Curated annotation (Swiss-Prot):
GO terms for cellular component: ATP-binding cassette (ABC) transporter complex, substrate-binding subunit-containing; membrane; outer membrane-bounded periplasmic space. Gene3D superfamilies: Periplasmic binding protein-like II (3.40.190.10). Involved in a glutamine-transport system GlnHPQ. Its main location: periplasm. The keyword Transport applies. The lineage of its organism: Bacteria, Pseudomonadati, Pseudomonadota, Gammaproteobacteria, Enterobacterales. SUPFAM superfamilies: Periplasmic binding protein-like II (SSF53850). This is Glutamine-binding periplasmic protein. Residues 1-22 form the signal peptide. Belongs to the bacterial solute-binding protein 3 family. Pfam families: SBP_bac_3 (PF00497).
Length: 248
């Protein structure tokens, strides 16, 4: 009887230890640190809207984590193989992506925008991109949109949006198609008056925090924290810090 009791106690102790370890696990959070103003490197620190939002969520849930920067095109495969626990990188929620990964509730309403050189008077909207060279970031919604809606002369894909902007700046592309907030931020902060946005924002969709399939418990906790941050004003503070206005 004592032997059975000892075994039972040992098993119970091990179970608690495993449970405690899972609870204390440092989460690995994938991010693409070349997507201003959502996530980018400033000095030796990662900053941005997504970075601040996740820090607030982690504080609310008392989660320990580390950021793992990677190219955007590698994020979904990393989630599928569970090499990371979640990802924030301006990831648009789409039905196609939902087949491969899970998403939190939407946390930012975005869209796509066309950017051209400031002296370009030929391209006034996305309708004028047929027969043009268009630069995009690989693995993003801009690629899908361009393939489905634009008869480009050449659709040039780059792993980093900075390379796409450079392609336009050096006149090797006629336009860039990318996420609205990133284009507007680039024009305002680094464009030096050389670029302009044309036309309306396209394909309004939500960004979501991405998880591997089967992460229901963590996802539900994150959704709860997001709701709390919206209700207590923290979300609005972070939004205003990075976009200069209250969310609509």
């Amino acid at each position: 009887m004592k032997s059975v009791l000892k075994v039972s106690l040992a098993a119970l102790t091990l179970a608690f230890a495993v449970s405690s370890h899972a609870a204390d696990k440092k989460l690995v959070v994938a991010t693409d640190t070349a997507f201003v103003p959502f996530e980018f490197k400033q000095g030796d620190k990662y900053v941005g809207f997504d970075v601040d939002l996740w820090a607030a969520i982690a504080k609310e849930l008392k989660l320990d984590y580390e950021l793992k920067p990677m190219d955007f095109s590698g994020i979904i495969p990393a989630l599928q193989t569970k090499n990371v626990d979640l990802a924030l990188a301006g990831i648009t929620i789409t039905d196609e992506r939902k087949k491969a990964i899970d998403f939190s509730d939407g946390y930012y309403k975005s869209g796509l925008l066309v950017m051209v050189k400031a002296n370009n008077n030929d391209v006034k909207s996305v309708k004028d991109l047929d027969g043009k060279v268009v630069a995009v970031k690989s693995g993003t919604g801009s690629v899908d949109y361009a393939k489905a809606n634009i008869k480009t002369k050449d659709l040039r894909q780059f792993p980093n949006i900075d390379n796409a902007y450079m392609e336009l700046g050096t006149n090797r592309a006629d336009a860039v198609l990318h996420d609205t907030p990133n284009i507007l931020y680039f024009i305002k902060t680094a464009g030096n008056g050389q670029f302009k946005a044309v036309g309306d924002s396209l394909e309004a969709q939500q960004y979501g925090i991405a998880f591997p399939k089967g992460s229901d418990e963590l996802r539900d906790k994150v959704n709860g924290a997001l709701k709390t941050l919206r209700e207590n004003g923290t979300y609005n503070e972070i939004y205003k810090k990075w976009f200069g206005t209250e969310p609509k």
